[in-house]
Amino acid sequence: MERWPWPSGGAWLLVAARALLQLLRSDLRLGRPLLAALALLAALDWLCQRLLPPPAALAVLAAAGWIALSRLARPQRLPVATRAVLITGCDSGFGKETAKKLDSMGFTVLATVLELNSPGAIELRTCCSPRLRLLQMDLTKPGDISRVLEFTKAHTTSTGLWGLVNNAGHNEVVADAELSPVATFRSCMEVNFFGALELTKGLLPLLRSSRGRIVTVGSPAGDMPYPCLGAYGTSKAAVALLMDTFSCELLPWGVKVSIIQPGCFKTESVRNVGQWEKRKQLLLANLPQELLQAYGKDYIEHLHGQFLHSLRLAMSDLTPVVDAITDALLAARPRRRYYPGQGLGLMYFIHYYLPEGLRRRFLQAFFISHCLPRALQPGQPGTTPPQDAAQDPNLSPGPSPAVAR
């Protein structure tokens, strides 16, 4: 009988020894991830036996097994104890659900809301413990930010401030960048970038003292050019770069910075169809006549319909995002980036590794597929469509007025 090659035997003994130690410490996640890791190691073993000399095969297998078991280790969590966390944008969505979870875990939660009598604020006041404090704050108003900073400093003297969750976000328009008013870009930057910047800088003395955490909710739209999200995506790209800068600069102070890049989720603001309809009508009412003539009302109606259709694929369970925020606050070694949601791995692979044309087609198929603006449609008087636009297979003819209505 053929003997088992010694590199395989030695490597599997090392893997088994480490797995046993992790099991004794209850530090190994069982289930399908473990089975998948073992299957991959077995396949790697087969390849190493045929392609590598025994010493190299032993080294590769042992290293792969060590890395796999490290990835399967249960994440070490810090105790909650009396830690205090400030969360912005708790009227609804991720902020509200995160505030509820952290309060149930024993955190002292300072939750900011736009309105103290909003439905989300009333829900938090009803279902959470007396430890949770609601604070009114509009990130576009420096006076509100100053008041929250003073309150936080005064009410965390005994516990210190462990974490800041920059969750509040803002988007007004889903349209081409040329169609989006400059005021929309400014308002997105005010909330998503400057508001987070001012609040973070104001709380850094407390966070440096506690060697705490900064968690910011970003968006994949800040990493890749989502169609019709120019204002929102630009602000999210800016805040992501800012947080990466903070991450490097605050490392000597022991402050860890994480960014959450969630997929498409059905938060209250996203699924409010009436709100998006009002914003579309406001955009049409204020659009310069020249742009309205060039693009056409049907074009904007088409974008709006595509956007609402894409929301049907959004996830209604916000738990993955809440869990990511919680892990960033309590993990002994939090990640720099979290990507909760479905399909993000494929999206980022396509964005980083495939040609630009394929990236553009994928984003249009996934989110919003453009039609031709009115001025580029065949038969329009006085207009000759550019050659590249006429030949672009991603652009479909504009919908007829009957379909748009």
From Swiss-Prot:
Changing P227L: In hypertension; decreases affinity for cortisol. Residues 396-405 have a biased composition (Pro residues). Its EC number is 1.1.1.-. Keywords: Disease variant, Endoplasmic reticulum, Lipid metabolism, Microsome, NAD, Oxidoreductase, Steroid metabolism. Pfam families: adh_short (PF00106). Residues 335-339 are annotated as: Essential for protein stability. Changing Y339 to A/F/H: Reduced enzyme activity. It catalyses: an 11beta-hydroxysteroid + NAD(+) = an 11-oxosteroid + NADH + H(+); cortisol + NAD(+) = cortisone + NADH + H(+); corticosterone + NAD(+) = 11-dehydrocorticosterone + NADH + H(+); 11beta,17beta-dihydroxyandrost-4-ene-3-one + NAD(+) = 17beta-hydroxyandrost-4-ene-3,11-dione + NADH + H(+). One of its GO terms (biological process) is cortisol metabolic process. It is found in: Microsome; Endoplasmic reticulum. Catalyzes the conversion of biologically active 11beta-hydroxyglucocorticoids (11beta-hydroxysteroid) such as cortisol, to inactive 11-ketoglucocorticoids (11-oxosteroid) such as cortisone, in the presence of NAD(+). Functions as a dehydrogenase (oxidase), thereby decreasing the concentration of active glucocorticoids, thus protecting the nonselective mineralocorticoid receptor from occupation by glucocorticoids. Plays an important role in maintaining glucocorticoids balance during preimplantation and protects the fetus from excessive maternal corticosterone exposure. Belongs to the short-chain dehydrogenases/reductases (SDR) family. Interacts with ligand-free cytoplasmic NR3C2. It is linked to Apparent mineralocorticoid excess: An autosomal recessive form of low-renin hypertension. It is usually diagnosed within the first years of life and is characterized by polyuria and polydipsia, failure to thrive, hypernatremia, severe hypertension with low renin and aldosterone levels, profound hypokalemia with metabolic alkalosis, and most often nephrocalcinosis. Consumption of large amounts of liquorice can lead to apparent mineralocorticoid excess and hypertension. This is 11-beta-hydroxysteroid dehydrogenase type 2. It comes from Homo sapiens. The lineage of its organism: Eukaryota, Metazoa, Chordata, Craniata, Vertebrata. The gene is HSD11B2.
